[in-house]
């Protein structure tokens, strides 16, 4: 049965997903593509070269470390499990977003407003739910515009630091 997280638990469960989503950019485009360079039925890449096994592992690992810190700081072990699930969900949601962008004919780095900002967040929320954790509805709704703004600001910063070729 699903367990409703308190507002604080909800926030602390979502933060690892934010960390997981931002971590792969630190690899600066190095890695083995998850899709192996394969193309889908439409002739376009399944995910594209930007989604790598190394990036996936880095994101999940980074988010898991943040989850461990949150669980340790609050003496609440369920935050570790929730944070790990949120991190995995964030990475899977981001990959689904890349799959959708390729189907729409959008190249790597092309902007897709809202999809770019909310694919990983939706994936994190769904993974938490699938694992039996329900993010407090007020937090889920309040965090949506925050996630959009944070995504934009962190991507602009990554672009200025030359970690990303585009600021979106």
Swiss-Prot record:
Pfam families, per database record: CarS-like
GO biological process, one term: glycerophospholipid biosynthetic process
Entry's localization field: Cell membrane
Pathway stated in the Swiss-Prot or TrEMBL entry: Membrane lipid metabolism; glycerophospholipid metabolism
EC code: 2.7.7.67
Full protein name: CDP-archaeol synthase
Record carries keyword Lipoprotein: no
Source species, domain of life: Archaea
Gene behind the chain: carS
Job description of the protein: Catalyzes the formation of CDP-2,3-bis-(O-geranylgeranyl)-sn-glycerol (CDP-archaeol) from 2,3-bis-(O-geranylgeranyl)-sn-glycerol 1-phosphate (DGGGP) and CTP. This reaction is the third ether-bond-formation step in the biosynthesis of archaeal membrane lipids.
GO cellular component, one term: plasma membrane
GO molecular function: CDP-2,3-bis-(O-geranylgeranyl)-sn-glycerol synthase activity
Lineage: Archaea, Thermoproteota, Thermoprotei, Desulfurococcales, Pyrodictiaceae
Topology within the bilayer: Multi-pass membrane protein
Organism expressing this protein natively: Hyperthermus butylicus (strain DSM 5456 / JCM 9403 / PLM1-5)
